[in-house]
Structures are given as C-alpha cells and as structure tokens.
Regions:
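Long, distal/terminal scaffolding or interaction modules
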Residues: 1-171
Length: 171
C-alpha cells in the first residue's frame, strides 16, 4: 500500500488490493486478486498471470503489464481511467519512430526509465529477468525462454489515459 520507491518480486499469487496506491515502486507477481493496482499513481506493476476483478480502478498514473494468455483480461479490468494497448515489438517501434529497426546494437542501450511512454518491450523483459534472478520463478523462466511467443500474449499495457498527453505537455 502506497509504496513510493523500491522493487518487489513475489513468486506466486497475491491477494486482493495488491499495489493499491503504488506511487513509484516496481513490483512483479504471478497473479493477483480483485482490485489490483487500485488508485495507483506511479510505478510499474507486472502481473505474470490472472487478475481478479476491478483491476486498475481509479488508476491515475504508472504502468501495469499483464500477461493475458486467454484474452479475457479486458473483462476484469476497470477501463474508466485506463486504456489497454499491445506491447510493441522493439524493432517495430524503432522503425516507426526513428527508422532504426534492428539497430539497437549500433546505437547502444537506451535508458528505459527516462521515458515511460516508450521502450515497453525492453522494460518488460528486463523486469521479468530480474524477477527470475531474485525468485528463480518457473513462470518467468518459461516466459523468457519463449519470449517471441509470450510477448504478444503480454500484449496488454495499461497507462492512465492522459499519461502521454501530460508527459508531452510538461516537457
């Protein structure tokens, strides 16, 4: 409740109201009960499994990545203040924005924390890798070992509806 910083990697499923009022922490879980990410204002949450009902209710900031293997997450997510979108493949994103598809090696690594409106695939994969490192999670290993198959299933990225507009207007 109300974490402002730090990282949390939990191997297994958590109960109701996980990451409520999260305002800056990064957290990974393998499933969550009802009301996950409720009133979240910042930070990043990764859910590597099913969610309960009313996910993201009142969420006004941050990003949540949810593995949606069966395509039913939209029925359990409260869409009043958030939108769902696919996690773009990095090569597609680089090509569409910078015409540098397949060129990450040439340009070096990017700071994935400096711009929360881009770098979703790299950020997500990095966070799942840390989850595997700290928890030895079989779920994380399975996902990373078959990334090309799982990335599209992760295809749900949640951002507060005005997150990108606000970020652009403040710069």
């Amino acid at each position: 409740y109300g974490a402002i910083d730090g990282e949390c990697y939990l191997r297994g499923i958590v109960g109701e109201r996980f990451a409520v009022r999260n305002s800056g922490a990064t957290a990974v879980v393998e499933g969550v009960g009802d009301h996950g990410c409720e009133y979240m204002t910042g930070g990043i949450v990764v859910v590597l499994g099913k969610t309960g009902l009313n996910f993201a209710a009142g969420m006004s900031g941050g990003i949540a990545y949810v593995l949606d293997e069966d395509g039913t997450f939209k029925n359990r997510c409260n869409l009043a203040m958030v939108e769902l979108e696919p996690v773009p493949e990095e090569d597609d994103l680089l090509e569409s924005e910078h015409h540098h598809g397949g060129d990450l090696e040439h340009h070096g690594r990017v700071d994935i924390s400096s711009d929360m409106t881009r770098y979703d695939e790299e950020r997500l994969r990095n966070i799942i890798s840390r989850h595997l490192k700290f928890t030895r999670s079989d779920v994380a290993k399975k996902i990373l070992d078959d990334w090309d198959n799982f990335r599209p299933k992760f295809s749900i990225s949640i951002r507060y509806l005005n997150f990108s507009k606000t970020s652009v207007s403040m710069s």
